[in-house]
A protein has these predicted regions:
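Functional cores of ribonucleases/endoribonucleases
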Residues: 20-31, 35-41, 119-185
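Domain-core detector
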Residues: 1-60, 64-123, 127
Length: 185
C-alpha cells in the first residue's frame, strides 16, 4: 500500500498516522580537483533512502545525502519518455531493429496505433511507482543511474493483464526518463 493510501486509511479509521518515506538528494561536493564520473551523474538525483546507490560511493567520496520533503517528491517528480521509444522503436514498423519486441506487444493485442496510449500509461505507472520507491536499482556508470520499474497493462485480446519491466534513467530533481519500454518479463 502506498504512503498516501496508508495516510488516508489512518485518517478514516482514526489510526496512527504513518511515517512519511525518507527521500534523499545526492549532492556531489567539489572539494578537490578529482571527481568521480558516477558521483557527478548522481548530483541532485533523488532516491528513497532505503533504495539509493551505496553511500559513500567510494573511499574518497565527498558526496552527501540531503533530506527532501516527501511533499516535494509527490509534487515535483516527473516521468518522461520520447514517443520514438514506442514508434518506431518498440513497434518497429520498418524492421529496423532486431529486438522483435513488436511481436510480443502484438501478441497482447497492441499495434503501433496504441503507441501514444502505451507511452502515457507507462509514464503514469513509472512515476507512481518511482515516488512510492517501487523501483530496482540497476547499473550505475558514467552515463548515470539506471532503475527498473515493473508495470502492468491489460491485454487487448484477452481479459487479463500482463506485467513487464521498464528501464529508466534517473536525472536531477526527481526526473526519470524512459530508456526502454520493455526490459524483460
Amino acid at each position: 500500500m502506498s504512503f498516501l493510501n496508508e495516510l488516508f486509511s489512518a485518517g478514516v479509521w482514526g489510526e496512527k498516522t504513518p511515517t512519511a518515506p525518507q527521500w534523499k538528494k545526492w549532492i556531489h561536493r567539489k572539494l578537490s580537483d578529482n571527481h568521480c564520473p558516477e558521483c557527478l551523474k548522481l548530483h541532485e538525483c533523488w532516491f528513497l533512502r532505503t533504495n539509493a546507490p551505496s553511500w559513500p560511493h567510494h573511499p574518497f567520496c565527498h558526496c552527501v545525502l540531503e533530506d527532501i520533503r516527501y511533499n516535494d517528491v509527490l509534487t515535483k517528480c516527473r516521468a518522461v519518455s520520447a514517443y520514438s521509444k514506442f514508434d518506431p522503436y518498440l513497434f518497429n514498423p520498418e524492421s529496423k531493429y532486431p529486438h522483435k519486441k513488436e511481436k510480443l506487444f502484438n501478441s497482447w493485442g497492441y499495434t503501433v496505433v496504441d503507441a501514444k496510449w502505451l507511452q502515457t500509461e507507462i509514464e503514469k505507472q513509472g512515476l507512481e511507482k518511482y515516488v512510492n520507491g517501487e523501483y530496482t536499482l540497476g547499473k550505475l556508470d558514467y552515463n548515470g543511474q539506471r532503475i527498473s520499474i515493473r508495470v502492468e497493462i491489460p491485454r487487448k485480446n484477452q481479459s487479463s493483464n500482463v506485467s513487464f519491466v521498464t528501464g529508466w534513467m534517473v536525472y536531477p530533481n526527481g526526473k526519470i526518463q524512459l530508456a526502454t519500454p520493455y526490459g524483460g518479463k
